[in-house]
C-alpha cells in the first residue's frame, strides 16, 4: 500500500511539473530570450513615442503612438515596451560573480512586431504602432529590436514616457467581507507606509462620508519561487492596500474613493466608484451570480499576442461590463491571468477587470498547485477557499 501511494504521488508530481511546463508556453513574454540580447545601436535608426506625458485627464490608461525607422529592416524586427525605462545591466541582481550579467535582465511588459500595422515596413524601414499603456508606478521606454525574439539585438532606444502621477492609487477590486454587511476594497499604488497613509473615503450615495484606514503589503524578489519571476519576469509590484467598509445597510448604494495622505499634508485621490451592499441574510431576493474560470488576459492594442490564444478574455470582460447592472457578484475560480512569473501582467489583469471588480465583489478561488492534476485524475480534494488574492 505504501509503495502504491509513493507511485501515485510520483505521478501527481510529474503531471504537475508537466502542467507547469505547458502553462509557461501560454505566456507570450516567455518567447523572448531577453537574457541573450546584445546592443547593436545604429545611428541611422530611431524610435520615438508621443505624447511623453500620459493621463492628463486623470485616466489610468492612455494611448500613444510609437514611430520608428531602421536602415536594415527585417520581418523579425519588433518593438519592446520596458518599465521602468532603465532596463540596463545595472538593474541585474548579483548572482554568480564568475559570470558576467546579461546586458538586459528585465523582460518587456509588452511587445509587438514592427510590421504589425505597417505591412510595408520591410521595404521602407518605416513604421508606427498605436499602443495602450496603463499606469504601473514607473516610466516607460521603447526599444527597436532586430534579429527576432530568440537572439534579439537592440537597434534604437526611445525617449521616456510617464503618467502624470505614476504612484496614483489604481485598479480597486471589491470582495465580500467575512460577514454579510462588510465589503473590502483592495488597490495598488506606488506609496509605501513611509510616504503616505492609505484610506478609503466612503458613504451612502448622496449621504455623509466616513473614512476607513487601509493596511499596506508588498513582496520582494526573494518571495518568488524561481525563474522567471526572480529573474527576467521580476517587476516591482508596488504596494497593495486593503480597507474594510463595515456595517453596511442591506441593498444600499455606496460610493467610495481611494486616498493617500502624504506626510506633507497633501492628499492624492482616485476617481469615485460605487457598489451595492449585500442583502440581509435570508432576505427574499434574486441574486445574479457569475461564475467562470481560466479567463486569462489580453491587450486591447493587440500586443503580446501568441496564436490568438487569449483574445477571448477581452470578450468576456466586455460582456460582463455590458451586463454589469444585472450582476451582483463574480466568482473567478482559478487560472487567473496566466502571468506565469511575469509580474507586470498582474497589473494588466487588474486594469482589465477594474470596471467589474470596482463595482461588484470579485471573488478569487485560491487553489493549491495540484488542482490541475486533481481535475485530470478525478482526485477528491477539499474545496477551495474563496478569497480575494489579487
Segments (PLM) and residue ranges:
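Divalent metal-dependent phosphoesterase catalytic cores across multiple superfamilies
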Residues: 24-39, 43-46, 54-56, 63, ...
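Extracellular glycan-modifying ectodomains
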Residues: 68
Amino acid at each position: 500500500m505504501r509503495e502504491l501511494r509513493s507511485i501515485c504521488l510520483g505521478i501527481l508530481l510529474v503531471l504537475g511539473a508537466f502542467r507547469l511546463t505547458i502553462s509557461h508556453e501560454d505566456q507570450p513574454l516567455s518567447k523572448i530570450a531577453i537574457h541573450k540580447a546584445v546592443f547593436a545601436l545604429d545611428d541611422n535608426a530611431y524610435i520615438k513615442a508621443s505624447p511623453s506625458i500620459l493621463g492628463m485627464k486623470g485616466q489610468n490608461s492612455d494611448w500613444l503612438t510609437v514611430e520608428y525607422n531602421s536602415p536594415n529592416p527585417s520581418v523579425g524586427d519588433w518593438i519592446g515596451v520596458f518599465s521602468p525605462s532603465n532596463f540596463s545591466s545595472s538593474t541585474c541582481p548579483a548572482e554568480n560573480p564568475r559570470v558576467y550579467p546579461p546586458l538586459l535582465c528585465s523582460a518587456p511588459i509588452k511587445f509587438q512586431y514592427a510590421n504589425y500595422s505597417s505591412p510595408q515596413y520591410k521595404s521602407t524601414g518605416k513604421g508606427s504602432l498605436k499602443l495602450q499603456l496603463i499606469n504601473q508606478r514607473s516610466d516607460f521606454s521603447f526599444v527597436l529590436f532586430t534579429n527576432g525574439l530568440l537572439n534579439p539585438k537592440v537597434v534604437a532606444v526611445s525617449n521616456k514616457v510617464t503618467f502624470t502621477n505614476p504612484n496614483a492609487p489604481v485598479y480597486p477590486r471589491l470582495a465580500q467581507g467575512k460577514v454579510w454587511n462588510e465589503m473590502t476594497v483592495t488597490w495598488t499604488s506606488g506609496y509605501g507606509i513611509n510616504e503616505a497613509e492609505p484610506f478609503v473615503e466612503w458613504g451612502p450615495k448622496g449621504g455623509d462620508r466616513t473614512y476607513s484606514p487601509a493596511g499596506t503589503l508588498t513582496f520582494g524578489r526573494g518571495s518568488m519561487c524561481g525563474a522567471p519571476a526572480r529573474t527576467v519576469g521580476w517587476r516591482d509590484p508596488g504596494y497593495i492596500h486593503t480597507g474594510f467598509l463595515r456595517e453596511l445597510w442591506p441593498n444600499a448604494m455606496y460610493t467610495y474613493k481611494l486616498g493617500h495622505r502624504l506626510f506633507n499634508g497633501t492628499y492624492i485621490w482616485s476617481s469615485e466608484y460605487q457598489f451595492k451592499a449585500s442583502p440581509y441574510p435570508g432576505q427574499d431576493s434574486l441574486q445574479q451570480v457569475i461564475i467562470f474560470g481560466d479567463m486569462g488576459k489580453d491587450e486591447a492594442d493587440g500586443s503580446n499576442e501568441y496564436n490568438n490564444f487569449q483574445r477571448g478574455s477581452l470578450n468576456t470582460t466586455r460582456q460582463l461590463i455590458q451586463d454589469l447592472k444585472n450582476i451582483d457578484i463574480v466568482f473567478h475560480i482559478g487560472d487567473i491571468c496566466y502571468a506565469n512569473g511575469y509580474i507586470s501582467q498582474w497589473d494588466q489583469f487588474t486594469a482589465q477587470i477594474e470596471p467589474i471588480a470596482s463595482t461588484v465583489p470579485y471573488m478569487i478561488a485560491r487553489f493549491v498547485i495540484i488542482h490541475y492534476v486533481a481535475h485530470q485524475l478525478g482526485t477528491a480534494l477539499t474545496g477551495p477557499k474563496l478569497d480575494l488574492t489579487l
